[in-house]
Amino acid sequence: MASDEGKLFVGGLSFDTNEQALEQVFSKYGQISEVVVVKDRETQRSRGFGFVTFENIDDAKDAMMAMNGKSVDGRQIRVDQAGKSSDNRSRGYRGGSAGGRGFFRGGRSRGRGFSRGGGDRGYGGGRFESRSGGYGGSRDYYASRSQGGSYGYRSSGGSYRDSYDSYATHNE
């Protein structure tokens, strides 16, 4: 991970900007170990962003502060730490998995609704859950409901126990 510390994401590039142009602009801030302009796999045209990796993290920080918002080949560029940018993206994905937690809560209330014979109550819980669950949570919830409802939930619990028991036997 230490090798990515001096790596900068450079976005908003002109499609005409190449590695040499980026290196020329950024090299005044310090020793550069790598410059990559990301290209489309089929057309080999620039996709409008790239990465500049500095040998020294302090040089990278100086370059980021100085170059963010500046113009290169007629386009205003955005410069950010490469690691920070991908952290934000992965945090977004993890946030999407909150739908899984929503399903678990929905599963419990559905069980309660089922034992009282209140199918509508379970459905209402689903609607409330989808509102609080946020993105994609409702889709997961309804897809899971359609795959067997409470019985599916219980039987998967049984199969988990079965596989656990067989695992324990093999272990001894």
From Swiss-Prot:
**Induction of synthesis:** Up-regulated upon mild cold-shock and hypoxia.
A GO molecular-function term, please? mRNA 3'-UTR binding
Q: Which InterPro entries match?
A: Nucleotide-bd_a/b_plait_sf, RBD_domain_sf, RBM, RBM3/CIRBP_RRM, RRM_dom, RRM_dom_euk
Q: Name one Pfam family in it.
A: RRM_1
Question: Which Gene Ontology terms describe the biological processes this protein takes part in?
Answer: cellular response to cold; mRNA stabilization; negative regulation of cell growth; positive regulation of translation; regulation of cell cycle G1/S phase transition; response to UV; stress granule assembly
Tree of life domain:
Eukaryota
Q: Where is the composition biased (Gly residues)?
A: 93-105, 114-137
Compartments, as annotated in UniProt = Nucleus, Nucleoplasm; Cytoplasm
Q: Which Cys pairs are S-S linked?
A: none
Note down the stretches annotated as region Disordered: 70-172
Query: Outcome of R91K?
Result: Inhibits translational repression
> What positions does the domain RRM occupy?
6-84
Q: Does the keyword Cytoplasm apply?
A: yes
Consequence when changing R110K: Inhibits translational repression
What is said about its interaction partners and assembly?
Answer: Interacts with EIF4G1. Associates with ribosomes.
* The protein, known as: Cold-inducible RNA-binding protein
